[in-house]
């Protein structure tokens, strides 16, 4: 007889987990919104990480490298590659150009040094690398189709306030990302340590660098990403010290940091022309003691079949499967 499994959160990780488990279990996903992939899954920059962005965190870089190919194969129809990706080493970077080169070569990364034609003297070296983005609409369509084919049930507009509301299920998986610790506390369970949750901003804009994405490393600079054609030329830009520190006005509305980030971008690229479009805001959770962005799977106790899954980069969903298999026979 097939056992029943509950998953809290119909984001990318929750949907992938539901499809993974559906071969052996009856799966029900509980989602408090009226659609899937509306929160953290939609706030990511859509960059398919190869590890280039993490020269100071080999654990994250290696995890990205390991899961890159499985993601590319799994979602081949959603991959976008019609742009150039530039990595620029800032003059006051946490890593020198030599250190960056040593790390990337040891990881087997594909890149080449190019002439600095657009950056100011705040950049010492520029590298062109092979990087990709993805179309979230296509990925969403793929996952919903597979959920339907595997009879994964999704309960929309259903907020789970206490995990023991789901005590009639044989196993419970928490995939609600930034809200996991709140749910654990409400359930009388121990929250995940060293996790910081905060409101983050995703800025959508246009510039005159056609089909060029830029990442300035390593420090509090900025990272841009080209988007699929359906976004009509829009790009996204983030800068952790700005987009992860959001203020609220007297009316309770989030205040965008785009003007400060645009000023920074002009310091590095003097001739850039910038046009703000809009921003999206949402909760984000990270390891507050390091910039490690790997996936973590934790069983809440030996006598409870409750599992917390804290997603990392989007490709790291494949390491979630490995960790689950190591915990039990799923």
Where are these regions (language model features)?
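N-terminal Rossmann-like FAD-binding beta1-loop-alpha1 element of flavoenzymes
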Residues: 3-28
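Glycine-rich FAD pyrophosphate-binding loop
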Residues: 23-42
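Central helical "cap/lid" subdomain
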Residues: 37, 171-214, 254-255, 271-272
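Helical element adjacent to the flavin cofactor pocket in flavoenzyme catalytic cores
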Residues: 127-164, 171, 175-182, 317-325
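C-terminal catalytic lobe of FAD-dependent flavoproteins
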Residues: 269-330
